[in-house]
Structures are given as C-alpha cells and as structure tokens.
C-alpha cells in the first residue's frame, strides 16, 4: 500500500504533545519579538529626542506597573487558565506595538503603551513560568531548560538580521506590522493545548510580604541580581551600540551571530545542569559573565562588540541554564504554592528593575557614559550564585 505524506497530518501529530505545543508557540513568538526587541529601546530613545533618562523612565514604568498588577494577574490566571492567559497576552502586546506605531501622533499613546505592555507581561510571564514548572520533570529539568533556550534562540538567530534589514530599508512601521502578524500566529499552538487551572490564594499584602521574609533573603539577592543584570543587557547594551554609530543591520548581525554560537552550548549546558555539577556550572558561568561585562567596557569597534557579546552570550548561557533549572526546581517543590512563589519572583524581579532604571535615569543626567554601567553588570552577574547553593540535584 503506498505511503501518502500529508503535511496537515504531520503538523497535527507534531503538535499533539503538550511540551511541543508550548515550545512551538514560544519559538514563533520569539521569531517575531526577536525582530524588534533589540531595536525597541533605540526606537523609544529616538522618540524621546535621544534622551537616555526619559527612555529609562518609560521602560522602568512598564516594569513598575507590572509589579503592581501581577497579584491581580495571578488571580485572573486562576480563572482563565495558564494557556488562555498566554494567548490573551498576545493581544495586549499587539496593542503595545500598535501604540508605538502611532506614538508620534499623540503623547496619549505613551501611557497607553506602558499600560498595554504591563498587562501583556502580567498575563504572559507568570503563566509561562508556572506552566513550565508544572510540565518539566525534575530529573531532566536542566535539559528541558536547555531545549527551551534553543526554542527561543533558533528563531532569534535569524530575526535580528531580518529585523535590522527591514528597519534599514522600510523603517519601523513595516517592522511593527510584521511583528504583529507573527505574534498572532504564535497563538495558534495554544488553541490546541489542554489548559491547566491554578488556584492562586495570596492576598496583595501576603504576596508582597514574601520579599521581606528572612528565609527568602538569598533568593531575593539572586533574583534582584538576575533582573538588574538582564536590564543592562536588554536596554543599555543596544543603546550603547547605537550611540557608537553601529548601523541597524550590523547591530542585528552582532546579536544574531552571538545567538548562533550560544545555541550550540545550550543543549550541553542543559545536560550538565541535570548532573551534580549544576552549582559549579552556575559559578563558572557567573564569573565568565562578569568578565565579559568588563571586556564590554572597552569596546570601541563593531568587531569588538561582536567578540565581547559572543563571549557574554556563551557565559550567560552557562550561568542562566543552571540558574533557571534551580529556580524551576524550587517552584516545583512548592507544589500547590508554585504559583505563589512565581508571583513573588515577578514582584521582586520587576519592582527592583523599576527602582534601578529610575535610579539610572537620574544618574545619566550628570554622568552620561553608558559603558560605565557595564562594570555594575559585572558585579551583578556574581549575584546569580546566591541561588545556586540552595537546591542541588541528587548525585546520580
């Protein structure tokens, strides 16, 4: 009997598994977001007349509002389910980029953009972390975090180059339109998913009070360090390259080639993170990440930027995979309280980022040298190790 290959049947078979649906949706999402994320701070920077303080105040406001809304988000996620929350978040992110598209028409779109992105984050990130903590298995969590990294990295290897090319030829309006379409497509796999309900029980006071518990002190330090270091990479590093007069296409190329190198390490770092060497891997990655930030301080040319960012991405992967694996281990060990722990993480992650970005905005008024803050990131990178000593996998 002849074999008939049906693309529709193949896609249906491929998307039957819950993890596959999750990873596919994330991969498509980052294909779109990867086109614009690296250029987004630059767009906002140009809108505010090349003012770094105003740019940081705008971004910090998003994270601050996210921190204030996330407890309500946890209760809403309890009602609509994890997958539906991630699905609905796309429409708010869609609205955010639409607001950026029209931001030059009226200043009204500035607060609207802040509100829409905050709501989008509130629906997506807690649901994302809870879902991953639930379906990933303890014995293979490092490997699954590595696979998640690859699901994010593979599309984002190409998307910054594509985004940079679109931006250089057609401008931001066409780029935002493409991103909006891809975001909507990324929701399709979630329609195929069996949803999961969580019961989030923390009051507003109890959720915020978790930050001040003595038992969470080391977690606090690790999560704050992680958040602030990522902020410098996400917001100041792109601005630094732009101020250096590196073109959009070159910036996209630097990010893409660095991510390509990183993808090679993600799978192996994930396997090591499932062994008794997780803590050692985290410490090694944290130290190397710190060194890479010191090297970024001395960047003068696009080639320097490529080399140092490639080292950073490799080092950050070596630190980030065991860090995330440990975080998900702690969350999963909480069982019914996993969602409460993750909401606590979102509060401390974003409120610390808001205060940090607001502080930087003030500092930039009197000390506008961007690369000086790369040395701050070098110190913050070492703070990731505070999480590494708390949960170690059993030796096998």
Go through each PLM region and give its residues.
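Cytoplasmic helix-loop-helix junction between adjacent transmembrane helices
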Residues: 115-152
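Helix-loop boundary and gating motifs at the non-cytosolic
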Residues: 3-67, 213-256, 312, 373-374
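Symmetry-related core transmembrane helices of the 12-TM Major Facilitator Superfamily/SLC fold
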Residues: 174-192, 371-389
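Structural signature of the two symmetry-related core transmembrane helices
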Residues: 84-99, 180, 280-295
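Hydrophobic core of transmembrane alpha-helices in multi-pass small-molecule transporters
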Residues: 27, 107-124, 224, 303-320
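Helix-to-loop junctions at the C-terminal end of transmembrane segments
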Residues: 69-82, 167, 264-278
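Conserved MFS/SLC helix-loop-helix module at the cytosolic interface between two early adjacent transmembrane helices
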Residues: 68-104
């Amino acid at each position: 009997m002849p074999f008939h290959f049906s693309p529709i049947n193949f896609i249906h078979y491929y998307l039957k598994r819950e993890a596959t649906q999750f990873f596919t949706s994330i991969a498509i999402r980052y294909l779109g977001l990867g086109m614009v994320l690296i250029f987004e701070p630059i767009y906002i920077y140009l809108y505010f007349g090349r003012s770094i303080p105003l740019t940081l105040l705008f971004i910090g406001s998003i994270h601050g509002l996210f921190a204030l809304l996330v407890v309500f988000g946890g209760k809403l996620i309890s009602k609509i389910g994890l997958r539906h929350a991630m699905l609905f978040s796309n429409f708010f992110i869609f609205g955010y980029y639409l607001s950026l598209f029209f931001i030059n028409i009226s200043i009204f779109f500035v607060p609207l953009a802040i509100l829409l992105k905050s709501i989008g984050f509130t629906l997506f990130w807690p649901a994302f972390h809870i879902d991953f903590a639930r379906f990933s298995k303890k014995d293979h969590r490092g490997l699954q975090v590595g696979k998640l990294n690859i699901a994010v990295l593979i599309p984002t290897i190409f998307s910054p180059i594509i985004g940079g090319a679109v931006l250089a030829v057609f401008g931001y309006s066409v780029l935002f339109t493409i991103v909006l379409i891809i975001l909507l497509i990324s929701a399709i796999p979630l329609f195929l998913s069996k949803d999961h309900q969580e019961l989030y029980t923390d009051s507003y006071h109890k959720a915020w009070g978790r930050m001040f518990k003595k038992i969470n002190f080391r977690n606090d330090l690790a999560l704050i360090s992680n958040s602030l270091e990522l902020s410098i990479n996400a917001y100041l590093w792109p601005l630094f390259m732009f101020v250096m007069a590196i073109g959009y296409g070159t910036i996209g190329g630097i990010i893409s080639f660095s991510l390509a190198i990183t993808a090679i390490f993600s799978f192996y770092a994930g396997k090591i993170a499932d062994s008794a060497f997780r803590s050692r891997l985290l410490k090694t990655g944290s130290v190397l990440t710190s060194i890479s930030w010191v090297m970024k301080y001395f960047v003068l040319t696009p080639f320097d930027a490529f080399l140092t960012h490639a080292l950073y991405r490799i080092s950050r992967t070596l630190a980030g995979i065991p860090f995330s694996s440990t975080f998900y281990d702690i969350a999963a060990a909480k069982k019914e309280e996993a969602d409460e722990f993750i909401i606590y993480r979102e509060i401390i992650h974003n409120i610390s980022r808001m205060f940090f970005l607001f502080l930087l905005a003030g500092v930039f008024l009197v000390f506008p040298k961007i690369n000086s803050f790369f040395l701050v990131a070098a110190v913050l990178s070492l703070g990731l190790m505070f999480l590494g000593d708390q949960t170690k996998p059993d030796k096998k």
